[in-house]
């Protein structure tokens, strides 16, 4: 419906423009009422005058603009169009409003009816922008169709000259200029008015009325079974047949859809060139005048059915759309080319400006270089004199610097020698510290060993005291248990002997540990003396180091908890006491 609306708007635009006498874009309300009523009548749309009054209620005085009329036209008329109207009658109504005010007063070789058909064809081929024009490509297409319909040869060179003259003045032709062009006979020289009129009518039937093919053929009746000559007209979805080609007496229609088909039939009953059109409800037997016409009709009907199945528009409408798309594509390419040319031109101008700027910069640079060269030559002599004085001064300074460097080198060598001596002393001091550290580690190891031995000794002593108490308890037992206790005492005595031996062994180990501790202590004192000696030497050289000597230690027994709470004499006294108690118990 969008395409139908655009086609209707073109004809309505002509009618509205004709009513706009002063070209101001405004038409009086009374004229719009008449136009709206006529449009509703020819388009089979119910007319609502109240809606028009309501739409323009704020503009009762004076004319109203076409911007205000367009919303009304779209809402109350065009949106209600269903397509069940006479296209020719609609166009003729719009033509009646605009023809008298726009047709040329000069005599034309075509009739008013032919001019009307050319005007309708113009609306079909014109561009979808206002004011309406037909571009030269579509003019060429139309003239070729007319020339072909007249059976004449196409004059391409003549049209090229006309096209060149046309392109220099405007983009295309208006409807009235196209009518003047065809009516002037410029491209139909040697043809009479009747031939031109027939050609216009043929092109009108094809492009506007969607007539794909027409002609006389015989049709077999369904009731009486007789053959009657009819004038057949093939359109995209229907085949209509009439009594004659004036289309006044219509006898019937053959409705086409995607389920229809056409088949050739063999000759029979004296009829030749037969073919059959099959539809859902009935079939039609047709007889053409010759085999060529038969094949043309079969091919045309098959093509029409194929288009119906595919949902495609008629060939001439599809071709028009393709031509428009091609023109749009070429126009886009041309605009892109023009844009690129403008960019190149702009870039070229920018380059020229840059070159001019560079040239000026080079000239200025050359002038500056000449001036600088002059200044350089002038200052060169001054610099040479100044450099000579500075050279003498530098020689004297260099001599003084060499003397200072020699003195500093000697001082540096002495300083490095002292540094090497200090490094050697530090190295020896580090070795002495390592020896002292190792001696302290040995002392700690011996101390831990002595503590472990004392702990084991204490455990054995506690065990011996426990056994002694048990022996005293066994003495107080009865005589009946004495023998058994004696045996147990002998066993315990043996165990006590073993424990005493272990205690003696531990005593020996403790003494050995004390001896090792004394040796380690001597080594530690020796290492401390060596460390103190080296530290004194380092302090003597540096004047900084002062060693603090540790105080002397008295030898004493060491346990896991520190110095022992008893002496060796007390330990021997306790051993004698334990032996005496053991002997008395026996």
Swiss-Prot record:
InterPro entries: EF-hand-dom_pair, PH-like_dom_sf, PH_domain. The PH domain is essential for phosphatidylinositol 3,4,5-trisphosphate binding. One of its GO terms (molecular function) is DNA binding. Residues 316-538 form a coiled coil. Keywords: Cell membrane, Cell projection, Coiled coil, Cytoplasm, DNA-binding, Membrane, Nucleus, Phosphoprotein. Residues 210-306 form the PH domain. GO terms for cellular component: cytoplasm; lamellipodium; nucleus; plasma membrane. This is Switch-associated protein 70. Tyrosine-phosphorylated. Phosphatidylinositol 3,4,5-trisphosphate-dependent guanine nucleotide exchange factor (GEF) which, independently of RAS, transduces signals from tyrosine kinase receptors to RAC. It also mediates signaling of membrane ruffling. Regulates the actin cytoskeleton as an effector or adapter protein in response to agonist stimulated phosphatidylinositol (3,4)-bisphosphate production and cell protrusion. SUPFAM superfamilies: EF-hand, PH domain-like. Gene3D superfamilies: Pleckstrin-homology domain (PH domain)/Phosphotyrosine-binding domain (PTB). The SWAP complex consists of NPM1, NCL, PARP1 and SWAP70. Its main location: cytoplasm. It holds the Pfam family PH. It comes from Gallus gallus. It is found in: Cytoplasm; Cell membrane; Nucleus; Cell projection, Lamellipodium. It comes from the Eukaryota.
């Amino acid at each position: 419906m969008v395409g139908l609306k655009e086609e209707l708007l073109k004809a309505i635009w002509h009618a509205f423009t004709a009513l706009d006498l002063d070209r101001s874009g405004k038409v009086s309300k009374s004229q719009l009422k008449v136009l709206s009523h006529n449009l509703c009548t020819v388009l089979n749309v119910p007319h609502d005058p109240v809606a028009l009054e309501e739409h323009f209620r704020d503009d009762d005085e004076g004319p109203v603009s076409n911007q205000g009329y367009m919303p009304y036209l779209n809402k109350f008329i065009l949106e209600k169009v269903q397509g069940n109207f006479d296209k020719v009658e609609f166009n003729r109504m719009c033509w009646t409003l605009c023809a008298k005010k726009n047709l040329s007063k000069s005599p034309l070789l075509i009739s008013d009816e032919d001019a009307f058909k050319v005007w309708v064809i113009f609306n079909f081929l014109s561009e979808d922008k206002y004011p309406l024009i037909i571009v030269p490509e579509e003019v060429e297409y139309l003239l070729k169709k007319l020339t072909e319909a007249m059976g004449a040869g196409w004059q391409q060179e003549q049209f090229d000259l006309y096209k060149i003259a046309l392109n220099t003045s405007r983009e295309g032709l208006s409807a009235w200029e196209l009518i003047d062009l065809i009516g002037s006979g410029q491209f139909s020289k040697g043809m009479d008015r009747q031939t031109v009129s027939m050609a216009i009518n043929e092109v009108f039937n094809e492009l506007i009325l969607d007539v794909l093919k027409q002609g006389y053929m015989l049709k077999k009746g369904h009731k009486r079974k007789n053959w009657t000559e009819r004038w057949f007209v093939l359109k995209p979805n229907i085949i209509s047949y009439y009594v004659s080609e004036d289309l006044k007496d219509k006898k019937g229609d053959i409705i086409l859809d995607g389920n229809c088909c056409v088949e050739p039939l063999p000759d029979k009953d004296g009829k030749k060139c037969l073919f059959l059109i099959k539809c859902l409800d009935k079939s039609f037997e047709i007889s053409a005048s010759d085999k060529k016409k038969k094949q043309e009709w079969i091919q045309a009907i098959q093509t029409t059915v194929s288009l119906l199945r595919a949902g495609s528009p008629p060939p001439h409408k599809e071709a028009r759309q393709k031509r428009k798309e091609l023109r749009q594509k070429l126009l886009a390419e041309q605009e892109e080319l023009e844009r690129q040319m403008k960019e190149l031109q702009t870039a070229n101008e920018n380059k020229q400006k840059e070159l001019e700027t560079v040239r000026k910069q080079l000239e200025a640079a050359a002038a500056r270089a000449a001036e600088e060269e002059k200044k350089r030559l002038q200052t060169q002599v001054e610099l040479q004199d100044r450099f000579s004085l500075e050279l003498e001064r530098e020689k004297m300074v260099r001599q003084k610097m060499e003397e200072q460097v020699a003195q500093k080198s000697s001082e540096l060598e002495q300083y490095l020698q002292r540094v090497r001596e200090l490094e050697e002393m530090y190295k020896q001091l580090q070795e002495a510290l390592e020896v002292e550290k190792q001696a302290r580690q040995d002392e700690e190891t011996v101390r831990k060993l002595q503590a472990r031995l004392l702990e084991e000794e204490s455990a054995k002593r506690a065990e011996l005291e426990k056994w002694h108490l048990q022996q005293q308890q066994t003495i107080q037992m009865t005589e009946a248990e004495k023998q058994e206790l004696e045996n147990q005492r002998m066993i315990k005595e043996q165990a006590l002997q073993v424990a005493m031996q272990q205690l003696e062994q531990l005593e020996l180990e403790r003494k050995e540990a004390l001896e090792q501790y004394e040796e380690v202590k001597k080594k530690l004192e020796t290492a401390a003396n060596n460390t103190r000696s080296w530290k004194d030497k380092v302090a003597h050289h540096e004047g900084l180091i002062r060693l603090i000597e540790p105080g002397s230690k008295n030898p004493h027994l060491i346990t896991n908890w520190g110095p022992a709470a008893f002496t060796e004499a007390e330990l021997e006294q306790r051993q004698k006491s334990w032996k005496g108690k053991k002997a008395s118990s026996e």
